Amino acid sequence: MAAGSACGMFGSWASAARAAAKGEKLYDLPRAGNVSFLHFTDCHAQLIPIYFREPSVNIGLGIMNGRPPHFVGEEFLKFHKVPANTALSHAYTYLDFEKAAKAYGKVGGFAHLATLVKKMRADRPNAFLLDGGDTWQGSATSLWTNGQDMVDACKLLGVNMMSPHWEFTLGAKRVEEIVQKDFAGKIEFLAQNVKTTDFGDQVFKPYVIREQNGIPVAVIGQAFPYTPIANPRYMVPDWTFGIQDDNMQKVVDEVRSKGAKVVVVISHNGMDVDLKMASRVRGIDAIFGGHTHDGVPQPVLVSNPGGKTLVTNAGSNSKFLGVMDFDVRDGKIASYKYSLLPVFANMLPADKEMQALINKIRAPYQAKLQEPLAVTEGLLYRRGNFNGTFDQLICDALMEVKGAEIAFSPGFRWGTSVLSGQTITREHVMDQTAITYPYTTVTDMTGEFIKTVLEDVCDNLFNPDPYYQQGGDMVRVGGLTYACEPGGKQGNRISDMRLKGQPIDPKKTYKVAGWAPVAEGAKGEPIWDVVETWLKSKKRITPRALNLPRLIGVQNNPGMAS
């Protein structure tokens, strides 16, 4: 079931890296069945190798406490039986991040991912390559090419099927153009839960059935259910979304009735939602999940009225490739083997054809991408339930440039990391901000309304029912301090809000800066311009002091760094 302990012989980051350079066995993975899937998700348009720090806070509550994906650091290693100070422990956790990153180098990059895909397909020539979505957004080149860079890269990579989320922020017209023209006859764009608002017609194919080694296999797509809530509704005005368990059951029953012996779902629900769906819908063999960026080494086996379903999640940023082998005998799955392989750029040579495409894509923008803006003296990262240091930088820039007392920055999970001592380039800033609605805003808000905003976002993150978790991580906050009780009741999780040590007055008005408004017609200076202005004025960026809330009731949670 596990990705294995292939690097267990390593005793330190340095010795592990030296052994890896000599050719360790991480990627020696013989086929273990007759139906295979390769899965990546949430690459967020990262074509070149990057640094990416995994979260130190990923809190699970209620039934989600103490089960994947809500483990971090040492608790993660303990639960998943991953040896410390190894390639795998670096890939899966934040532990000693900078030290390990310098030892192992960058991760991901489509040229290195392509090499790994080809290596896995050499032993699995008919394996399906699944793309879990959030592929066409997240970088400067994806924004500037309207997603074309990633469309071309995915075609060359050999993707067979995908399901969407951030793709919809390019707008319905652009999505349909890509599906109907670029993907025609090449990549299946699947979403059983996207329908027209007028008659409820299916907008995209809900599934495909294809044979692999003579065995009929159904692949069903599940788009992010809350796209019109988490992202601008006006970009997809004529389509409805939602989880749609009942429709999923109908689709599963339909493909089974058509003879499918293996049924899998490419899902962008998020792992907690997938776990609940797996407990309710019968007949799914595996859910290949995304959205929550959880690199989970082993599948979770979930019981339901019809049997059992495997649930996986394959991380983000082209940092991982999931490999699932099913051994199908007499029309049933007799056994399976799953591995979540980290993509270390120093261990996998760049595929020449993919590298040539990437070079071609980036060439017109290279000077613009690499323009130096400042040097950071501390590690910059985003991922985690609460403020990351790059988010703190964005909040600090918003408050100073816009003259605001308080700043809010969205709790996006995407965004690469920058090591201390590195030059911050325009590309790094775009990695944090490249969206189609980048407008900054300055709004007068009462203390009462500020609390309402924080409570609403907090409920989206920590609602005890996964089906009501409708967004990303907690909104990032600058200037304002507060306490948060994740396990509290709706409307009562936020307390002790203060500005410069003084309690927030519910009736008083405060000047609040933010960005990424979802309302139609919003305008304002793009966030990347604000951040660039601030960085250039500073030249050297001192380590950011994280404005983290005082957390209540989660002291022993395995999703909290010790």
Labelled PLM ranges:
Residues 67, 74-75, 79-81, 86-92, ...:
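A short C-terminal boundary segment appended to hydrolase-like catalytic domains
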Residues 169-174, 181, 240, 270, ...:
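General structural signal for secondary-structure boundaries
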Residues 216, 379-380, 481, 503:
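Short, solvent-exposed loop/turn motifs
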Residues 115, 119-122, 177, 181, ...:
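Charged/polar, solvent-exposed surface patches and flexible loops
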Residues 111, 148, 173, 246, ...:
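Generic alpha-helical secondary structure signal
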Residues 23-36, 40, 46-62, 186-193, ...:
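Feature captures C-terminal
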Residues 4, 8-345, 385-397, 461-463, ...:
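Acidic, metal/ion-coordinating pockets
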